[in-house]
């Protein structure tokens, strides 16, 4: 890890799998990198992660610890617990520095990044040629009294991550969003005993309900009172009419919120869900600003997918920095 400096090639905002994967690849390219970690991981409630090659069954917090350790082993690496408050563009993007018949590098700029220290750490203000936004998303669960207590230990949001453990069991999908029917079709490949609970919200159309019925998926639109269960997990969904539907666990579709107030001055393009719009290489609508992981479309995916996204965008950033000397002056 290098001594503290005030100027970097890349500032990475967020220290999840996307941000740390990108940071690791960038320091290996001898780029001067600062990772700013607000220490609010979306997977904080999840006890075990799945599907990460060589790390299946590893807790997400352990994956983050190992990733930080590997990143900080390089002399160009810096890491700080700090919540980014503002990113300001200080200069117009420089011209595209390199072009061939098959590849054109992106433009980079100059930015000031201001961050407030967390957990007793100091504030930090630095400048950087590029910024990678890998903040992930904030989750808003349906407003049920006990749902947060079971989240990560009986109710999950990632079907690809946790569907296997509920194979052939009676399971629930709680969701109030317009894509809940599509998610139910996906979940139905793990169990033929699935009930979709929309909590009184008209989230499933008649056509979607017919399609779900063909797959043996029930739809219960009654208002929910609460989730029932104990230390071993979820046992049922209690409705406001007093009845309970027995389940062994299941899934919830949160509403996801992109917290990008710190980048408001850059007017970054986003889709209808608030996710950042990027090109296939991770470049945002503002030259020199990139995004990776859950903050980009299609939103939350497996940890290994986010890590791969970070590695891919790191390669883009390094190419776009051609002509800017590395930490070793090359």
Each model region followed by its residue ranges:
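A conserved FAD-binding loop/helix module that cradles the flavin
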Residues: 23-24, 181-185, 292-330
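Beta1-alpha1 glycine-rich phosphate/pyrophosphate-binding loop at the start
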Residues: 3, 8-66, 179-202
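Active-site glycine-rich loop that binds ribose-phosphate moieties when present
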Residues: 153-161, 173-183, 205
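A Rossmann-like FAD-binding core segment of flavoenzymes
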Residues: 65-128, 191-277, 319-330
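Residue-level detector of alpha-helix initiation sites
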Residues: 16-17, 139, 178-179, 296-297
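FAD-binding core/adjacent interface of flavoenzyme oxidoreductases
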Residues: 1-8, 80-168, 276-280, 284, ...
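FAD-site-proximal beta/loop scaffold in flavoenzymes
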Residues: 143, 149-165, 254-300, 312, ...
